[in-house]
Amino acid sequence: VDQKYLIFLIITVFVLSGTIRVFTLIWQNKFAARISNEITYKAYDVVLNQDYPNFIKQSKTDLIAIIHTFGNNLLVDVINPILFLFESTIFISLISFALFLYNWKIFLSIVFFLSAIYFLLFKKANKILKSSSLKQVNFNEKLLDRLDVELNSIEYIHLGNYQRICSNNYAKYDREYKLNTANYLITARLPRILIENLILILILFLILFLYINNNISQALPILATGALLAQKSFPYIQKIFENWSSISQYKNAALSVLNYSIRYQKDNKYNNENRKLLNFDEIEFKNVNFFYRKNSKILNNINFSIKKGDKVAIMGPSGTGKTTLLRLICGLLNPSSGSVLINNKEINKNKNNEYTVHWMRSIGYVPQKINLTGKTLRENITFKNNKKANNKIKIEDVIEITLLQDLVSRCNGLDSNILQNSFSISGGENQRLAIAR
């Protein structure tokens, strides 16, 4: 290529690359956000729709980490870097093409030099990042688990004066987590500093060599062109390495989200809109046995009947199966053997799924531990369901039935922020909120 066209060629490449960068910046981030949202939505839907026995075996903290924390990692540290890899590759290809047309010998020399260096870096970094990726997931789950347990045990911590012990233990895990993150960042960014300095030293030695041999004036245009191309292309080469490092670091976190997302099923014919409310006449247990694990029977040959209008209390020591029995009545669990009948019709998701789902829609369940779900009483009563939240008459009826008028008055209405204003809600009021829900 004639040198008089070189400047024009370089300007064209830079204008084109700048235009591409603007459009790709906007497109990549919005596209990555949509993809990440779709994946985490599907993963969360799968978590909520999995069989109840499988769900209760899992750590809720781990599930929160997978859906929220790792879902965010998926966007920032995996999908975005993958898209930026494409952008960097396109730009480097344009620069390489221009350099090849200008001087193919210089092009091949640079390619060989950088390939050799980055091959060694990739080989070394891969071992570090492989270990770091597994640690990242483990540390994150430990931190969330510790926070969940301790913040839900604040009475025990205050009574035992364990505040400093808990904060010191948290600091230990957090330190390990952040040092692991720091090691990843060092691994990803150190090559840029090393290679930039190495290239600068080589250029200075080359200039010195040419100066000694009185050839610097002839080589100056080539050096200037090479320096300009290097200044524009090297950040993208390093970006490729950093993006690869990010993907390697967070791939295990991303895979944990994808593992749920791929099991997503779009159609759910038993959603709320298609469920029928069943009238209740009789609940009957016939020879019901249940065990969570083999050789660990919880219920043994249970037989009883509850008629409409009966008031029944199930009593017994802890661990004898009272909660399990209620879960069987609700249809959350299937008997290991025997039958649970509602109106002389068996409820069992493995045998009669449609009828069981309709029954589950028709029954109310108030657990021992009630979690507040929103900032206002309205959000707690309606479970953040906008359609229910706007049904004023229905909400007023529910409040009257569950005797929550005093609580609503004390909290200055349904829409006051009960968490921000530190309203005291008793255990009994919590239970009635759950009944209202």
Regions inferred by a protein language model and the residue ranges of each:
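The feature captures the beta-strand-to-loop junction immediately N-terminal to the Walker
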Residues: 315-317
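Helix-to-loop junction immediately C-terminal to a conserved catalytic motif
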Residues: 330
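Transmembrane helices of ABC transporter permease
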Residues: 83-134, 205-219
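Cytosolic ends of transmembrane helices, especially the final helix of ABC transmembrane type-1 domains
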Residues: 139, 143, 155-162, 186-189, ...
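Hydrophobic alpha-helical segments in the permease module
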Residues: 10-17, 21, 114-117, 192-199, ...
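Short intracellular "coupling" helices and adjacent cytoplasmic loop segments at the cytosolic face
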Residues: 33, 41-71, 146-169, 243, ...
